[in-house]
Amino acid sequence: MMRTLVIRHLLLLLLLLLQPLQLQGGALQFSSFGNISEEFLEYLEEVMGTGPTRPPTQKKILQMFIAEPERPLLDWDYCSSEMMMRNVHYRFQCVTKHYFLCVSYEYLKMLCSMSVALCKNGTRRCRLSSHKIEGVYCNLTEGDRMPNCHYETIYRKGHALITCRWKKETREFIPDGVDDIVLLD
């Protein structure tokens, strides 16, 4: 019985045994030009790469989630312009929602040492700020690929709900993202 199954479906069996093809090129093909910065090569690798994303760095959190202190949050075009200027996307696909907070990186890092709270999706891996903070919620209204993403800017004042990630090198939790700005009373 088993022998007849193997003989009848030999091609399917061989296809299952094949190794997946590795993509050629990527960001490394640009390294031969010599005058391209390492930061740009890292950006290309993140956008075009097929592996897992790199853990967050202080620079990345500042770029992605910390609001510009001199720019008013009530600006109607805040989200559309900031998302474009800061390159907030996932492999050039528009991000459906995003948050910018008016806090320092040190404050977010301090939040990572707070007790665990429920995230919006119900998992227990977020941290909730004890003080109200100002921020902006960006909601995608139009577009699906950069640079055609247009966002609605919604000002919020509430408690920040952030996610943190363990950093092995320093043996501490560091900020990873913003889950929500919760309006608690």
Whereabouts are the PLM-identified features?
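Ordered, helix-dominated protein-protein interaction surfaces in large eukaryotic regulatory proteins
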Residues: 3-4, 110, 140, 164-166
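Short, structured protein-protein interaction patches enriched in aromatics and acidic/basic residues
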Residues: 121-141
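Compact beta-sheet-dominated globular domain cores
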Residues: 141-185
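N-terminal "domain-start" segment
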Residues: 2-127
